[in-house]
UniProtKB/Swiss-Prot annotation:
Residues carrying N-acetylalanine: 2
Organism: Homo sapiens (Human)
Name of the gene encoding the protein in the UniProt record: EIF3K
Name of the protein described by the UniProt record: Eukaryotic translation initiation factor 3 subunit K
PTM annotation (Phosphothreonine): residues: 28
Subcellular localization, as worded in the UniProt entry: Nucleus; Cytoplasm
Family membership: Belongs to the eIF-3 subunit K family.
Major localisation: nucleus
Length: 218
């Protein structure tokens, strides 16, 4: 992370003022994207600046760098980073490999087709070359979805949703989120009563307020 932090400070200066969209800075910004991928770090603002520079300077477009930006955006789900990045890529480039495959993976994740996502990823593992921590970042997102969706879930189903994890691997994620299993193979996620805390809203309306409203409506 030392290299990332050093580059982040330098890139932060580049992104200020009119130099933000100076094409001469593209090489530095592209190296910064590669550093994010290798060091499992993330800087959305810088990555959006790269995509904007590609919009302004189509001849400089780099498919590999754009693919890395999209994959890093997926690691930050459920935030809308992936959609923001996708909207800055023209349709012609969206049809190119590997961008087309990454957009498909993103669609599977955003629509919670997790088993299909892992199958598609397994068929395109070359996409993750140079990307550190991608799969575990996706698992964090899936656990987030599970946590707000389920009270109980079958052990085998959770293992599938997280990418066909072994029993020992599954236990690590269960421990991380405080989930427990019973003898029947069910995993207890949370109690609906504990996760939902209703608020009682009391609004006081005095007679003067009502009378003024009635008067104005006549």
């Amino acid at each position: 992370m030392a290299m990332f932090e050093q580059m982040r400070a330098n890139v932060g200066k580049l992104l200020k003022g009119i130099d933000r969209y100076n094409p001469e800075n593209l090489a530095t910004l592209e190296r910064y994207v590669e550093t994010q991928a290798k060091e499992n770090a993330y800087d959305l603002e810088a990555n959006l600046a790269v995509l904007k520079l590609y919009q302004f300077n189509p001849a400089f477009f780099q498919t590999t760098v754009t693919a890395q930006i999209l994959l890093k955006a997926l690691t930050n789900l459920p935030h809308t980073d992936f959609t923001l990045c996708k909207c800055m890529i023209d349709q012609a480039h969206q049809e190119e490999r590997p961008i087309r495959q990454i957009l498909y993976l993103g669609d599977l994740l955003e629509t919670c087709h997790f088993q299909a996502f892992w199958q598609a990823l397994d068929e395109n593992m070359d996409l993750l070359e140079g990307i550190t921590g991608f799969e575990d970042s996706v698992r964090k997102f899936i656990c987030h979805v599970v946590g707000i969706t389920y009270q109980h879930i079958d052990r085998w189903l959770l293992a599938e949703m997280l990418g066909d994890l072994s029993d020992s691997q599954l236990k690590v994620w269960m421990s991380k989120y405080g989930w427990s299993a019973d003898e029947s193979g069910q995993i207890f996620i949370c109690s609906q009563e504990e996760s939902i805390k209703p608020k009682n809203i009391v609004e006081k309306i005095d007679f003067d307020s009502v009378s003024s409203i009635m008067a104005s409506s006549q």
